[in-house]
């Protein structure tokens, strides 16, 4: 961050002191007599996002606030009376004006006096002809030239930091001056008055003021500025340690964050703010020093830029529509919605924050709980329910998960506490943040090395970074820098590290850095201990292993001459000195096999050894030293007598295993040195390779990971190339091939420039398709890469395939249109017409007509109904046409097949002929023409039964009593069964269901007849097919309309009754079935039997039917 010029006489806050406590409640009235002295430490300890002290009071001008804070550093006893009086009058005047008390009489008097002073100052300005003259006036009053205090040219240019790494630009900046108001690079603000003032119609809003332009009507404020500057400069010389309120550590806004605005400033233009360029953030290594008054992340703004224009302040005081902030804590409430905390406060205060569990708004009086990980706010009851629900349980952990950040908590919250956790069940106050206690937060920064606590009032969201500063040593420990407390970044200076490296000889030449230094990079040449090998290594390698001659071991035999002068060192390359000769007499104490001490052999008469060249005496026992052959269970030993030197070859055999240990074989020990100790068996490995596609199939395999050596070879997504990697599991990678030709769309308007990855589809084009189409209709689809264009959807008129009608609104791409009507074309047989729906092509094709023949039969007149046989005669078949037969009285009706009816007539005719035999035997003639004509065959009738006879008797009885047939005295019409036989059969299976249906239908018919509506419907519940069929059949009897809806198994029936059409039958179906189920009475017994005259015709008696006795046949 670019450093502003240090303020002379600035002081530094002690953050560890007891007074470093943020003010909990700001005094709302600066004009109160008991609270006139402001504590500058409290002003400085406000939060980074709190407004500066110049904003805390109700629109007090910057001049008055500056005066207030200049006097606030004196003790109460040492403050000059003149300053106290000035402070009281200034604060009182401003505070009263800000509260809108201009209408009071005493206030009007003060306004008039002030107006007189303004006119006098205006006259003083009129006397000055130019800017130098005005400058001389200020110089004469203050005794100091204004230009002498301007900073250097290097300090005037403050470069704005570009976050994208662009070259910094020189921006026009406000520079430090002791005058009132900003000064732009060498020009005083008083010189701005000579510029052209914009026209009123071209000016901005009322409160908007262009940067660097002063209106003519603000000259009175300029004059007062010139007069008052001398006194202020003298005050500054007397008290150099005082700081302005906007320089207080806690009162400056943080860079990158917009400070909260007052209500009166929200409608003003930001032109004055735009003139201040951003202060770039420099690296800590490049900054030479840090000002004691700089707070690290707080922008340093000049005093002149902090002071408001008197004219603007006056306009705001006189504007009745500008709302001022209420007094109390709400003035300092965090309102920056760009931060997490500011957004939470804004939403909770306005009751626009929603609970993530119930999706309801969080009210200011509702108990809440805030997650300490993500800082989301929930209703307390909602988070309790969530924590106890199975969905909140953490996998593999004991606890419950936060609905927002999934952070696992061990305990379920049961109490309603404020955000800082100090107060339970906090009461809501209109002047405080909802759900907060109003006290200082004092929470520690988690995970940071910061001893300070949060100095904000109790707030939601994360605590801001610690505003305190601390002195931190750089990594090399040579320089000190002032950094933010708890800042995790390390401090680096621009000096070399100069620490001793790992070699202990050289120093680190890198710049100040963190962590251990890199190993020494100097290359040295080292020699092994035996001097036969050398190597080049980095300095510091194998430190402490040097023996003065060599630095490492080369793993070769040493070979140096021993002290005995007869033997050489047989050890591996080692540091000096070599071990003494192992054959010296004082070192050899046992025989060569090691079983017998030499002292015993000397006692037995063996000669003693004097030099290393003398042989070692043998004990004469078996050597017994272990040999390298054999197995773990049985170790072979040397079978020779005690001897010097190596043992000879073993004369035994050893068992060795193959590589995979699947098979073994036996070999002589003498051949183990010439042959390999292992062999390969012929077993093939059947395990799958890592690719999962192939088997290993290796002979005597010993691999743990069976890698597949084959190439994958599968086609890639591009469809052009194959995978060239070793065979693997899963999907292949994308094709790495690329084309260096341009890939264009079909029309060439859109282009993808090379390199083009293989498999890339042509680019999408927004141009209209330019291909040649089959039709001449307008084209509405875009350019495409498919070979075939999408179908044309232009609506046209087309004939159907059978040329029956001209169809409209048919899309152009549809070719074969069917109208849905029967074809009706005459078939090749000439007798039938095509019954297919409107179709394409020929009606029959290779097939023949199979429709039934319509030629009438000769015997019955019904159609032939045989498959179409063209010109061939009709085949002789039985007629299967259905006809209706009736009895003589017409009561009985039955539908029968024509062939069955003719056979019945023949049976009746045979019976009639048998009854005429007697007449033929007597010589009488018999009329048989009626029995064999076709007319009689068509007039075949059924036989009357007992009911027909009963009905006939009732008719005669009615005629005898002269009863009219219209009255239906015997209920003949209603007794005629309206229920079909199939309905009766179905109803017998479930009489209770039929009874319930009849009751519903009767109630429906009565309701529609009595009600106002002409139609009324009833919906039956879903039922099976048999029950639905019963309802349909009964609906016909009752005159109801029945329709089935839905699909199985939810298919049901809805019946509708229509007034005048629906009627209840006189006899219900259940009544008819109950009557039929009753036992029938036996027929009447005949008193005499009629016999024929010829008793000899026994066959005729068997054929003839017994006559029915008619008791009502009365002869007149």
Curated annotation (Swiss-Prot):
Polar residues: bias regions: 73-106
Chain intervals for the UniProt region annotation (Disordered): 38-57, 71-322, 1069-1102
Function of the molecule: Binds to the X-box motif of MHC class II genes and represses their expression. May play an important role in regulating the duration of an inflammatory response by limiting the period in which MHC class II molecules are induced by interferon-gamma. Together with PABPC1 or PABPC4, acts as a coactivator for TERT expression. Mediates E2-dependent ubiquitination.
Main location: nucleus
Top-rank taxon, per record: Eukaryota
A GO BP annotation: negative regulation of transcription by RNA polymerase II
Region (Interaction with PABPC1 and PABC4) residue spans: 9-26
Compositionally biased spans, kind Basic and acidic residues: 146-159, 188-202, 222-252, 280-289, 306-319
Keyword terms, alphabetized: DNA-binding, Metal-binding, Nucleus, Phosphoprotein, Repeat, Repressor, Transcription, Transcription regulation, Transferase, Ubl conjugation pathway, Zinc, Zinc-finger
InterPro entries in the cross-refs: NFX1_fam, R3H_dom, R3H_dom_sf, R3H_NF-X1, Znf_NFX1, Znf_PHD-finger, Znf_RING
Annotated protein name in UniProt: Transcriptional repressor NF-X1
This protein's domain notes: The RING-type zinc finger domain interacts with an ubiquitin-conjugating enzyme (E2) and facilitates ubiquitination.
Signal sequence residues: none
Annotated zinc fingers (NF-X1-type), start-end: 450-468, 503-522, 564-583, 629-652, 691-710, 718-737, 829-851, 860-881
Pfam families: R3H, zf-NF-X1
GN (gene name): NFX1
Occurrences of domain R3H (ranges): 991-1059
EC number annotated for this UniProt entry: 2.3.2.-
Subcellular location: Nucleus
Entry-annotated residues carrying Phosphoserine: 50, 82, 95, 129, 150, 324
């Amino acid at each position: 961050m670019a450093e502003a010029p240090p303020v002379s006489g600035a002081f530094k806050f002690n953050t560890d002191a007891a007074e470093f406590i943020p003010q909990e409640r700001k005094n709302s009235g600066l004009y109160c007599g008991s609270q006139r002295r402001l504590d500058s430490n409290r002003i400085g300890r406000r939060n980074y996002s709190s407004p500066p002290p110049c904003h805390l009071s109700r629109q007090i001008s910057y001049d008055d606030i500056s005066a207030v804070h200049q006097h606030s550093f004196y003790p109460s006893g040492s403050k000059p009376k003149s300053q106290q009086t000035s402070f009281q009058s200034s604060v009182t005047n401003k505070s009263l004006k800000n509260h809108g008390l201009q209408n009071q009489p005493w206030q009007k008097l003060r306004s008039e006096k002030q107006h007189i002073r303004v006119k006098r100052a205006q006259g003083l300005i009129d006397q000055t002809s130019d800017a130098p003259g005005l400058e001389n006036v200020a110089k004469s009053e203050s005794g100091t030239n204004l230009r002498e205090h301007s900073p250097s040219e290097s300090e005037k240019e403050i470069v704005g930091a570009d976050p994208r790494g662009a070259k910094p630009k020189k921006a026009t900046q406000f520079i430090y001056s002791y005058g009132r108001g900003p000064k732009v690079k060498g020009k005083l603000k008083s010189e701005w008055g000579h510029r052209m003032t914009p026209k009123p119609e071209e000016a901005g809003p009322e409160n908007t003021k262009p940067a660097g332009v002063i209106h003519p009507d603000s000259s009175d404020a300029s004059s007062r500025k010139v007069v008052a500057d001398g006194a202020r400069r003298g005050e500054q010389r007397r008290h150099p340690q005082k700081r302005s309120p906007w320089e207080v550590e806690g009162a400056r806004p943080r860079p990158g964050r917009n400070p909260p605005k007052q209500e009166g400033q929200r409608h003003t233009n930001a032109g004055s703010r735009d003139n201040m360029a951003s202060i770039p953030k420099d690296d800590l290594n490049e900054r030479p020093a840090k000002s004691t008054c700089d707070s690290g992340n707080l922008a340093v703004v000049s005093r002149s830029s902090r002071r408001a224009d008197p004219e603007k302040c006056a306009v705001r005081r006189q504007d009745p529509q500008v709302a001022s902030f209420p007094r109390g804590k709400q003035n300092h409430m965090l309102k920056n919605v760009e931060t997490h905390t500011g957004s939470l406060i804004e939403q909770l205060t306005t009751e626009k924050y929603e609970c993530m569990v119930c999706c309801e708004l969080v009210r200011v009086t509702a108990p809440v709980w805030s997650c300490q990980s993500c800082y989301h706010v929930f209703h307390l009851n909602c988070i309790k329910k969530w924590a106890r629900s199975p969905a909140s349980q953490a996998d593999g952990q004991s606890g419950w998960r936060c609905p927002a950040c999934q952070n696992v908590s061990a305990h379920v919250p049961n109490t309603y506490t404020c955000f800082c956790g100090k107060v339970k069940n906090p009461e809501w106050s209109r002047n405080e943040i909802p759900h907060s206690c109003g006290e200082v937060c004092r929470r520690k920064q988690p995970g940071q090395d910061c001893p300070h606590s949060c100095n904000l009032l109790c707030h939601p969201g994360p605590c801001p970074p610690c505003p305190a500063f601390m002195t931190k040593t750089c990594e090399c420990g040579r320089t000190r820098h002032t950094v933010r407390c708890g800042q995790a970044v390390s401090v680096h200076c621009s000096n070399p590290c100069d620490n001793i490296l790992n070699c202990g000889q050289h120093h680190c030449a890198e710049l100040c850095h963190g962590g251990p230094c890199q190993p020494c990079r100097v290359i040295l040449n080292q020699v092994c201990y035996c001097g036969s090998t050398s190597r080049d290594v980095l300095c510091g390698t194998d430190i402490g292993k040097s023996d003065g001659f060599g630095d490492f071991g080369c793993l070769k035999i040493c070979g140096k001459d021993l002290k005995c002068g007869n033997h050489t060192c047989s050890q591996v390359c080692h540091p000096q000195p070599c071990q003494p000769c192992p054959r010296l007499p004082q070192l050899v104490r046992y025989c060569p096999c090691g079983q017998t001490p030499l002292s015993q052999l000397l006692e037995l008469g063996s000669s003693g050894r004097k030099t290393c060249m003398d042989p070692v005496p043998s004990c004469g026992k078996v050597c017994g030293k272990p040999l390298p052959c054999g197995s773990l269970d049985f170790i072979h030993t040397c079978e020779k007598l005690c001897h010097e030197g190596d043992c000879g070859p073993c004369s035994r055999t050893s068992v060795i295993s193959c590589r995979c240990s699947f098979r073994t074989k036996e070999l002589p020990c003498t051949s183990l040195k010439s042959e390999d100790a292992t062999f390969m068996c012929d077993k093939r490995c059947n395990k799958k390779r890592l690719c999962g596609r192939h088997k290993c199939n290796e002979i005597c395999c010993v691999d743990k990971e069976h890698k597949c050596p084959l190439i994958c070879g599968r086609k890639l997504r591009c469809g052009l190339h194959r995978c060239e990697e070793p065979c693997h599991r899963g999907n292949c990678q994308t094709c790495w091939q690329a084309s260096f030709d341009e890939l264009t769309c079909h029309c060439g308007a859109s282009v993808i420039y090379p390199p083009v990855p293989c498999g890339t589809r042509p680019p999408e084009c927004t141009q209209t398709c330019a291909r040649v189409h089959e039709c001449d209709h307008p084209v509405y689809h875009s350019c495409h890469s498919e070979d075939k264009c999408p179908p044309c959807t232009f609506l046209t008129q087309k004939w159907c395939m059978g040329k029956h009608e001209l169809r409209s609104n048919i899309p152009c791409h549809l070719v074969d249109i069917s109208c849905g009507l029967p074809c009706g074309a005459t078939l090749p047989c000439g007798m039938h017409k095509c019954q297919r729906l409107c179709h394409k092509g020929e009606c029959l094709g290779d097939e023949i007509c199979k429709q039934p023949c319509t030629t009438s039969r000769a015997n019955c007149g019904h159609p032939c109904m045989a498959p179409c046989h063209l010109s061939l005669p009709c085949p002789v078949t039985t007629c299967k046409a259905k006809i209706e037969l009736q009895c003589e009285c017409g009561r009985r009706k039955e539908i029968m097949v024509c062939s069955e009816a003719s056979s019945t007539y023949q049976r009746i005719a045979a019976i009639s002929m048998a009854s005429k035999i007697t007449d033929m035997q007597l010589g009488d003639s018999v009329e048989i023409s009626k029995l064999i004509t076709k007319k009689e065959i068509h007039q075949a009738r059924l036989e009357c039964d007992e009911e027909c006879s009963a009905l006939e008797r009732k008719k005669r009885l009615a005629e005898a009593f002269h009863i009219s047939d219209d009255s239906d005295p015997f209920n003949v019409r209603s007794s005629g069964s309206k229920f079909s036989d199939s309905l009766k059969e179905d109803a017998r299976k479930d009489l209770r269901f039929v009874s319930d249906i009849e009751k519903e239908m009767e109630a429906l018919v009565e309701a529609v007849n009595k009600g106002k509506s002409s139609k009324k419907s009833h919906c039956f519940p879903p039922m099976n097919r048999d029950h639905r069929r019963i309802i349909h059949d009964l609906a016909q009897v009752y005159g109801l309309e029945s329709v089935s809806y839905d699909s199985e198994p939810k298919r049901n029936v809805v019946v509708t009754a229509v007034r005048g059409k629906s009627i209840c039958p006189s006899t219900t179906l259940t009544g008819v079935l109950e009557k039929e189920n009753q036992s029938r009475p036996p027929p009447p017994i005949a008193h005499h039997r009629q016999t024929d005259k010829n008793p000899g015709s026994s066959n005729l008696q068997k054929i003839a039917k017994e006559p029915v006795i008619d008791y009502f046949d009365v002869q007149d």
